[in-house]
From Swiss-Prot:
Primary gene name: DPPV
Name this polypeptide is given: Dipeptidyl-peptidase 5
Keywords: Allergen, Glycoprotein, Hydrolase, Protease, Secreted, Serine protease, Signal
One biological process term in Gene Ontology: proteolysis
PANTHER family referenced in this protein's UniProt entry, alphabetically: DIPEPTIDYL-PEPTIDASE 5-RELATED, SERINE PEPTIDASE S9 FAMILY MEMBER
Organism: Arthroderma benhamiae
Amino acid sequence: MAAAKWLIASLAFASSGLAFTPEDFISAPRRGEAIPDPKGELAVFHVSKYNFDKKDRPSGWNLLNLKNGDISVLTTDSDVSEITWLGDGTKVVYVNGTDSVEGGVGIWISDAKNFGNAYKAGSVNGAFSGLKLAKAGDKINFVGYGQSTTKGDLYNEAAAKEAVSSARIYDGLFVRHWDTYVGTQFNAVFSGSLTKNGDKYSFDGKLKNLVQPVKYAESPYPPFGGSGDYDLSSDGKTVAFMSKAPELPKANLTTSYIFLVPHDGSRVAEPINKRNGPRTPQGIEGASSSPVFSPDGKRIAYLQMATKNYESDRRVIHIAEVGSNKPVQRIASSWDRSPEAVKWSSDGRTLYVTAEDHATGKLFTLPADARDNHKPSVVKHDGSVSSFYFIGSSKSVLISGNSLWSNALYQVATPGRPNRKLFYANEHDPELKGLGPKDIEPLWVDGARTKIHSWIVKPTGFDKNKVYPLAFLIHGGPQGSWGDSWSTRWNPRVWADQGYVVVAPNPTGSTGFGQKLTDDITNDWGGAPYKDLVKIWEHVRDHIKYIDTDNGIAAGASFGGFMVNWIQGQDLGRKFKALVSHDGTFVGSSKIGTDELFFIEHDFNGTFFEARQNYDRWDCSKPELVAKWSTPQLVIHNDFDFRLSVAEGVGLFNVLQEKGIPSRFLNFPDETHWVTKPENSLVWHQQVLGWINKWSGINKSNPKSIKLSDCPIEVIDHEAHSYFDY
């Protein structure tokens, strides 16, 4: 019955254009980055779509015509995990996840214009991905990554011997990271070659581990590292990879290096920017990222932070000469933005970089020899940039992006010219029908110390003469932001279309507004950010007539979850009808149970035992704060969240229950800091939206809104009375 009700609601909303439902949101096609062929005629991208009826997510690969934006199907084979251009016309190399080698993958070669006529070049004896290719004479050299055994072999889970005991024994950190207990395997970059025999290529199955010879090195670095952590020179002879500094404690410091190594592994990899090294700029000890060779292979650009234990420090562009002892050069080092990715133009004279700027991921250009005070130029495009690739040898790039109003924006951007639209998902996908920039607008308010930005997101069919309850959404990080980008988890438009106007603030600590605003949250989690939120809420109450703050709700995840817990004990907590806290800290001293100690040791100005007062300052569980609690609160926490233990959520719920405050605890034993599985995501939305709709009055004003009873999961309740009923 629940499934049928959801289907009917979805059809009703879609046909009348009244709402964007969680089912629409979860089942909308998800498209990956579009990668153009060498001639700049076609681009290939991955696409998947969840089917609620069949409970599966079939996937495949499509081709995008770069002249007219037409899309055609390349393959519907879900086992094809990645495709990359061979560098020869429309020929491609792809990885197939099913192979004759158990636990391995197949390397196949085909032509995008006749994909079914493929042949197998060889097998890799283990999980392997992230292919990058370069011609090297009559061979094609490649690199990719997988997990390494301690001996340096590619790890094959299917072939691994089962341990006689489940014990884990540690003599050092990490014990666990993000969602995984750290084991003996680690990520490594492997190299190999495709050899040409006649008109076909073959692979002999031999891989060289380029990382394992450097003791304690790892690349790509978990949990979010990928193919952007390494690069292959255009002649196929040299590989660059990023690893945390192998000689330093990884849980306490963010310091990482860019290593160079021959493709054949004939020498051990060496760092070009070692801490206090002869080439490294003075005082630069932070995290490195995005290594990329110049087209001629003589230089390498990368990004690096200065501070050794601060993951949200400002990145600066660095350029090093390959095979030289000359000092590394810093480029546009005074630019008050933090680049996220960098690429060279085909002539090696210009750098294209992405960076967050005023809550939008933008594309910029600058000369490769720019001075410190140079300000990069913006390239015009819509939404936020996820990735970009040069189209042939031109100055134009193919951008894959998204926005608050569309989950896929493919467009061509050229410096000094208007962007050219190829494909915008909201104009094609029925699930996204009606979404557009018309319902999004920025809001600037005087905060505690400076002007603070927020996004206002309005529902479908918004009428300025009507009044809508406030949904006050607080982002995580805390060094993060609500950007003009699509979220597959916390999506403001899904909330708005229940009948709210969403206000999504970027308070002190947010990124993309200059490094000072980001840095100012240090040791001030409940200070300036909270004051910013109060001022934004007051501005909305006093100046925006179509927003009803009397029946508003507040919700947040991670740092946003902490802030909701903090708000519960403050005056602002009494201004909301309901609260939602997802994976937020509760007890100040429990932060020591996190995985990345550098994070808390930076944000609280010291270690747990040397600066304990800083950890206790923003403790949501203080008795004097708990005494003020009264607002109904939904608490969400998952078992595989190793950023902060599930015990935080349980403890918070315990106190809410003992105080007799209407509350509910939602737990996913198979989810992490995030909820990503489709059926779990649907339940999450049913519970979260059902909770706020109940207390805000939306259930009464909008009969089509989600109710708690829409969720088919049985509620567990073994208590007849609250503790304080006795």
